Amino acid sequence: MPVTDGLRTLLLAALVALPVTLPTSAIARDVAGGPRAVEPNTLVPAGDARYAPAAHPDRIVASPAADPSRGFQVSWRTAAGVDAPLLELAVAGDTPDLGEARRLRAATRAFDIEQRLSHQHQVEVTGLEPDTLYAYRVQGAGGWWSPWRQLRTAAAPGSALEFLYFGDTQNKNASHSTRVVLEALRHAPEARLALFTGDQVSGGDGEDDNEWGEWFDAVAPLASTMLLAPVTGNHEYFEEFEDTPQERRVLGHHWPHVYDLPDNGAPDAAATTYWFDMNDARFVVLDGTSALDLGTAEAQAAWLDGVLRDSTQAWSIVAIHQPMFSPRQDRDNALLREHILPVLEAHRVDLVLQGHDHVYGRRGGPVEGQGTPQYLVSVVGAKQYRLSPEARETMAPVAEDTQLFQVVRIDGDTLRYEARTATGRLYDAFSLLGDRESGRSLVEHPEDRIPQRDCERAATLKGRADRCWE
């Protein structure tokens, strides 16, 4: 019998009307939960080797050269046995045919940590054109290559710049920092730089490499496609000879292997301080832990003074982990205010980007009516502390129990700053206008900001009253 349109319609209607019985396992149901458990610091089960080095390259990160308009620096990891692999580079185009790629050979160092022997590779890419999109990939073992990635070099002075600023990630990176990074990328599609102000991991307890593995998972969408500028925090250090008279701070093993940074740092802190120019801004990275605990505050201040004095850039941005003015209860970095603060004020640095205290706070400098510097403290990760009473009086806005990211846009004589929560809601916004010589003016943007956020918990799941969350 021929199937007419009418018959086809009847057959379909009959099929739709037939009852369908799904297996019980396929039906989603709410499950009653018991008491909330404390979440572990990583999602890695004991004995799991998911972050062991392999033939395929991973932990790929691009960092700024001193002149990011002409080059950048790339680091990556493989299993041991891969020596001096290649980086391939070409001007990106719309065709899969990237032409004859330029080839650069990496410098290789062995890295043995927590029973994992890896090889870390670093390449300095030079001789590039400003504001140009390049494609690059890195080599592993046996002819294995990473996927092609794309990165645009910095533009010449006079061009607009958008960048991201992140506070401490530190704890539970895969679980909690990932969503903040992804949300940040939604709000800053033109970002060319991501600046992290220290404590990227917590460190210690035989989990250091797993934590770095999770950190790279969390930041993977941006680590190799824009320049990543890291700051050392106290958790990038560890205590040697702990609880003895010889106790001292020592830089963790990952830092010099994971990052390849400009070689222009301060005396006695050369591995952890550096500067670079990008479009109209000079960025300077300090090491607060070294300044506070290793006696380099005076040397870093003198170096900072020279770097800022020699700058011809219209804007200056300084990043340091420990704040000049701490918003957290029972913290005070007086040594930084003694040595570093006068330099920041003398040069009218525009933004001082900080972390460490796991809350949010903003304040201007001690000079009344002066728009700059603006001192910022922020946090990405799950660890959340509480504000001090002094911070509530001297800073605005402030926040507890809030994961944040910041977007900064510089265009000519205007800098616009926005702090947004993990869900993208606007928490803080202001602009700096004018030039440094005549003095910048601060313009607040209160419209569309959400109300102040305060911690509503008496203690954490572990019972700590000094924290809002672990």
Predicted regions and their residues:
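Conserved, compact domain cores that house catalytic/ligand-binding motifs in diverse enzymes
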Residues: 161-231, 236-237
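Active-site-proximal segments of metal-dependent phosphoesterases and phosphodiesterases across multiple
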Residues: 290-293, 311-351, 370-371, 386-389, ...
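Solvent-exposed loop/turn segments at secondary-structure junctions
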Residues: 80, 169-172, 200-204, 234-238, ...
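Active-site neighborhood of phospho(di)ester-bond hydrolases with catalytic His/Asp-centered motifs
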Residues: 165-167, 194-199, 228-234, 287, ...
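Bacterial N-terminal signal peptides that target proteins for export
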Residues: 2-11
